[in-house]
């Protein structure tokens, strides 16, 4: 099985304007959409389109987390998220008015116990599985979380794929991920 991990999933609220954005003024939208995502979730979506099953893992919180989960299920994606007791899954606002302006939410705080629950889910992975760690991490997680997860799986034959930048990517290289992006 392929497992994707999105540490900070989001609902992207995309607003389109037919004129330039005017700061400090009322701007009327000519269209809007909600897009469910986060890098790992996006990978699960592409895999589903290719007919390849996967399980999307990560953290969700509050009504926005429940809404995200229902939306992914409606798209035919299988999820096994850790449900946080506090906070809400983030909402990012994307304003498309010639140029794109983004307002990205911070997302919920992820307590140590919730990270431990995710680690326990990953403990069942075997050499027949692929783990894809994708995207940024929220500030409440340790900066070495990717490295810690790969260390935890080291020697078990799980093929690990990492789609990240800067230290998140560089620090996992000693664990020889199957693929990096």
Locate the predicted segments by residue:
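A general structural detector for well-ordered alpha-helical segments in enzyme core domains, enriched
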Residues: 43, 118-121, 145, 149
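Cofactor-binding loop segments of dinucleotide-utilizing enzymes, especially the Rossmann-like FAD-
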Residues: 5-9, 59-62, 84, 136, ...
């Amino acid at each position: 099985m392929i497992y994707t991990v999105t540490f900070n999933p989001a609902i992207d609220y995309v607003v389109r304007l037919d004129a330039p954005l005017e700061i400090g003024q009322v701007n009327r939208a000519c269209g809007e959409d909600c897009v469910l995502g986060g890098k790992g979730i996006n990978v699960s979506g592409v895999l589903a389109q290719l007919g390849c099953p996967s399980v999307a893992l990560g953290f969700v919180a509050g009504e926005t987390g429940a809404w995200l989960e229902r939306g992914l299920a409606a798209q035919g994606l299988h999820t096994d998220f850790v449900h946080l007791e506090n906070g809400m899954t983030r909402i990012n606002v994307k304003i498309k008015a010639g140029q794109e302006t983004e307002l990205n939410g911070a997302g919920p705080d992820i307590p140590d116990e919730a990270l431990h629950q995710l680690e326990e889910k990953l403990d069942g992975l075997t050499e027949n599985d692929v783990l894809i760690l994708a995207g940024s991490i929220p500030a409440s997680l340790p900066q070495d979380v990717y490295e810690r997860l790969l260390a935890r799986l080291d020697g078990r034959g799980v093929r690990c794929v990492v789609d990240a930048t800067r230290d998140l990517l560089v620090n996992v290289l000693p664990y020889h991920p199957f693929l990096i992006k």
